[in-house]
């Protein structure tokens, strides 16, 4: 067995002296490398290949990291293993690297738990086994590690984007915390001075005013010149004298001051972080920041994962980036897909009118894709592309917003008037289709006319031949119809009787229909009422969300109660529907039974009628038979 060991100085090829020890457990192999003497008795150095320099070592290390066999190692193994025609197995530290050696040089490779313990023992006693100086090995390892780290950083631009990704995610977290702390301070201090919240809308001004004023009684003596404008300060002083709030203890004020201090510190760090993010975006993606802005650009990079991934995306994905849920929901329900995602927060899209926001987002996404590619792949950072694209997008926005009617062949001619009508994109979109339909209809009408002319000519030529045949066929048809009327089967008679009985039962059927319609109307009314109640509840929930950004424990309990009520309503609905279905089934069964009973009664009546008719016929026959006998008796008497 041979062992391949990679070091920073070169490749070492060891030979296992006692292969029987390899069959022992992996834990026992550590005992064979406790001392240099034991290690030399178990493993011996066969050959060692030394690197020419750090460049040679770096090439070999990069190839091994990519699971490729470097040329230096392949030549080394060919000389010492393949040329000597050794059928021994080669022990390797990595299984993937071993498969690469097996494919390239056709050498048997081994890698398992015992081999890993063997390589660990060789690494422990490497100095004694190779007979190398410790300082030289350390110097080679440090040089190789520095050069390899430089190589990895040079060819991985994704590592630089992590600063932007982490900064924008932290900025979003800070904004949520700031809103939570501000609302908490307003609710807490609102018990003491509720009028202050309506007078001061800015959160930072509100917190500074609380810190400066403290208790509302001292509002008259406090100076708000550095915090608030003069008009607002006077209103605050007047409101403090007529406030409806409750009294507050000094301990409560201390806790409110601590909350305000924490809020102001987070706010200050938020501003510092935005400045840091702006500087990083200008350094890493200057063209994208000019076009979209630093915050929107950072969010796009964060959503894509890195600037390189964003550069690989087409303009269509950049346009919808951030609206993946809405996109998949639209595809699932077969509705219209969203027109914009995170790019909606850009300044250019926000300034556009509501009708043209989709067009502006598409134009901006196209230029943003190009600017991201320049930022990711250009060696020299230059803002010329971003400035040029910004001007092009601004011109396009001006053209879209203040656009006149385009002169085209497909467009509908406008009416003659003094004022020029604005361009309507909805009409122009349908002009091509209407024109195509008109041309198709004209072509189809001409083709139909030609076909009709041909048919008429053929019919006129064949009229003289088929006149006699048509007369004879009509006579035969009339005879057959008369025969069929005369020869009506008993089955046809029964069908006629059933139809008559159905006509007689019309009032009952009408009453049943009326009952069904009344039930349907009641159901519809109930459903409409329930839908209205659900809509009212949804509106109330939306209002509560707008008023309060954070959910208090009371609000959570209310939500739970609402959910439970909804579930109870749904269960009641299900039970009602099941009951209604059962009632409908029972009604159907009763109707079927009634119909079957009515049919049986009819059959009995018909049978009685038939018996009566048959009895009458028998009497008539008897009377007929008796008459000639009486006549004969009279003649005999005469």
From Swiss-Prot:
It comes from the Eukaryota. It is found in: Nucleus, Nucleolus. The gene is nop58. Residues 284-402 form the Nop domain. Keywords: Nucleus, Ribosome biogenesis. GO terms for cellular component: box C/D methylation guide snoRNP complex; nucleolus; small-subunit processome. Residues 416-638 are annotated as: Disordered. One of its GO terms (biological process) is ribosome biogenesis. InterPro entries: Nop56/Nop58, NOP58/56_N, Nop_C, Nop_dom, Nop_dom_sf, NOSIC. Residues 437-458, 485-521, 527-574, 580-632 have a biased composition (Basic and acidic residues). PANTHER family: NUCLEOLAR PROTEIN 5 NUCLEOLAR PROTEIN NOP5 NOP58 (PTHR10894), NUCLEOLAR PROTEIN 58 (PTHR10894:SF1). Belongs to the NOP5/NOP56 family. Pfam families: Nop, NOP5NT. Involved in the biogenesis of box C/D snoRNAs. Part of the small subunit (SSU) processome, first precursor of the small eukaryotic ribosomal subunit. Could function in the small subunit (SSU) processome, first precursor of the small eukaryotic ribosomal subunit. During the assembly of the SSU processome in the nucleolus, many ribosome biogenesis factors, an RNA chaperone and ribosomal proteins associate with the nascent pre-rRNA and work in concert to generate RNA folding, modifications, rearrangements and cleavage as well as targeted degradation of pre-ribosomal RNA by the RNA exosome. GO terms for molecular function: snoRNA binding. This is Nucleolar protein 58.
């Amino acid at each position: 067995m041979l062992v391949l060991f990679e070091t920073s100085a070169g490749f070492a090829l060891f030979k296992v002296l006692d292969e029987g020890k390899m069959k022992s457990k992996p834990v026992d192999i550590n005992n064979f490398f406790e001392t240099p003497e034991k290690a030399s008795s178990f493993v011996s150095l066969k050959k060692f290949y030394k690197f020419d320099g750090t460049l040679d070592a770096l090439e070999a290390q990069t190839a091994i990291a990519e699971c490729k066999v470097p040329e230096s190692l392949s030549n080394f193994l060919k000389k010492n293993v393949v040329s000597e025609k050794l059928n021994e197995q080669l022990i390797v530290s990595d299984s993937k690297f071993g498969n690469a050696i097996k494919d390239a040089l056709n050498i048997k490779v081994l890698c398992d738990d015992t081999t890993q313990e063997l390589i660990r023992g060789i690494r422990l006693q490497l100095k004694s086994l190779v007979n190398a100086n410790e300082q030289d090995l350390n110097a080679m390892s440090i040089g190789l590690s520095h050069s390899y780290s430089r190589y990895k950083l040079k060819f991985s631009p994704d590592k630089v984007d992590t600063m932007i990704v982490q900064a924008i995610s932290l900025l979003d977290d800070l904004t949520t915390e700031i809103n939570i702390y501000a609302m908490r301070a307003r609710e807490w201090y609102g018990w003491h001075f509720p009028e202050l919240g309506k007078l001061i809308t800015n959160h930072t001004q509100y917190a500074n005013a609380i810190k400066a004023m403290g208790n509302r009684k001292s509002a008259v003596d406090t100076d708000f010149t550095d915090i608030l404008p003069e008009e607002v300060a006077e209103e605050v002083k007047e409101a403090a004298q007529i406030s409806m709030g409750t009294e507050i203890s000094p301990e409560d004020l201390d806790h409110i001051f601590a909350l305000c201090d924490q809020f102001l510190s987070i706010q200050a760090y938020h501003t510092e972080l935005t400045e840091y993010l702006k500087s990083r975006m200008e350094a890493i993606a200057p063209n994208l920041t000019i076009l979209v802005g630093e915050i929107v650009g950072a969010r796009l990079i964060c959503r894509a994962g890195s600037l390189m991934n964003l550069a690989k995306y087409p303009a269509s994905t950049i346009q919808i980036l951030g609206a993946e849920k809405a996109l998949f929901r639209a595809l699932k329900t077969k509705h219209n897909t969203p027109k914009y995602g995170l790019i909606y927060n850009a300044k250019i899209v926000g300034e556009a009118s509501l009708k043209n926001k989709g067009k502006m987002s598409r134009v901006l996404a196209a230029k943003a894709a190009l600017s991201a590619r320049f930022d990711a792949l250009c060696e020299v950072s230059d803002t010329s592309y971003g400035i040029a694209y910004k001007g092009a997008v601004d011109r396009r926005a001006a053209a879209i917003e203040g656009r006149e009617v385009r002169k085209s062949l497909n467009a509908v001619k406008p009416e003659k008037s003094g004022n020029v009508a604005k361009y309507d994109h909805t009409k122009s979109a349908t002009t091509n289709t209407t024109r195509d339909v008109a041309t198709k209809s004209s072509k189809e009408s001409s083709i139909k006319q030609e076909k009709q002319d041909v048919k008429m000519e053929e019919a006129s030529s064949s009229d003289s031949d088929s006149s006699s045949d048509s007369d004879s066929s009509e006579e035969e048809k009339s005879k057959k119809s008369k025969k069929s009327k005369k020869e009506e089967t008993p089955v046809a008679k029964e069908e006629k009787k059933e139809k008559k009985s159905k006509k007689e039962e019309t009032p009952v059927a009408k009453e049943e229909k009326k009952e069904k319609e009344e039930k349907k109307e009641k159901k519809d009314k109930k459903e409409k009422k329930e839908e209205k109640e659900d809509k009212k509840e949804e509106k109330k929930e939306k209002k509560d969300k707008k008023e309060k950004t954070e959910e208090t424990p009371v609000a959570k309990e209310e939500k739970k109660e609402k959910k439970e009520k909804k579930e109870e309503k749904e269960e009641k609905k299900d039970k009602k529907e099941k009951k209604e279905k059962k009632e409908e089934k029972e009604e159907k069964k009763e109707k079927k039974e009634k119909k079957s009973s009515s049919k049986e009664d009819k059959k009995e009546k018909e049978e009685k009628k038939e018996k009566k008719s048959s009895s009458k016929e028998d009497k008539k026959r008897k009377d007929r038979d008796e008459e000639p006998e009486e006549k004969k008796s009279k003649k005999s008497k005469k």
